[in-house]
Curated annotation (Swiss-Prot):
Its EC number is 7.1.1.-. Keywords: Membrane, NAD, NADP, Plastoquinone, Quinone, Thylakoid, Translocase, Transport. It is found in: Cellular thylakoid membrane. Pfam families: NdhO. The keyword tRNA processing does not apply. It comes from the Bacteria. Belongs to the complex I NdhO subunit family. NDH-1 shuttles electrons from an unknown electron donor, via FMN and iron-sulfur (Fe-S) centers, to quinones in the respiratory and/or the photosynthetic chain. The immediate electron acceptor for the enzyme in this species is believed to be plastoquinone. Couples the redox reaction to proton translocation, and thus conserves the redox energy in a proton gradient. Cyanobacterial NDH-1 also plays a role in inorganic carbon-concentration. It comes from Prochlorococcus marinus (strain MIT 9313). NDH-1 can be composed of about 15 different subunits; different subcomplexes with different compositions have been identified which probably have different functions. GO terms for cellular component: plasma membrane-derived thylakoid membrane. It is a peripheral membrane protein. This is NAD(P)H-quinone oxidoreductase subunit O. The gene is ndhO. It catalyses: a plastoquinone + NADH + (n+1) H(+)(in) = a plastoquinol + NAD(+) + n H(+)(out); a plastoquinone + NADPH + (n+1) H(+)(in) = a plastoquinol + NADP(+) + n H(+)(out).
Length: 81
């Protein structure tokens, strides 16, 4: 049996409707963070956000605030607890 990649394992753990937050370390060391606002809002790290869709290693997250939904890599998301 072939080994699976880490994003595929994360996708299995995070499904549509899950409550998530952004992993600060994974996000801050990413290309997306380098191309974004230098100080991202705290609410993305505190959560919860609802995972609306999962597609090809990315998840669409809706925050409980009047802000646009965002697509983030699944490996940057973690379950909210």
């Amino acid at each position: 049996m072939a080994e699976t990649s880490a994003p595929a394992k994360a996708t299995a753990a995070l499904k549509k409707g899950a409550l998530v937050r952004v992993n600060r370390h994974a996000f801050s060391s990413s290309t997306e963070a380098a191309a974004s606002d230098p100080s991202p809002p705290d609410y993305i790290f505190e959560g919860p956000g609802e995972l609306l869709a999962v597609k090809e290693g990315y998840g669409q997250v809706r925050w409980r605030m009047p802000v646009p939904d965002v697509w983030l890599r699944i490996d940057q998301l973690e379950p909210f607890s």
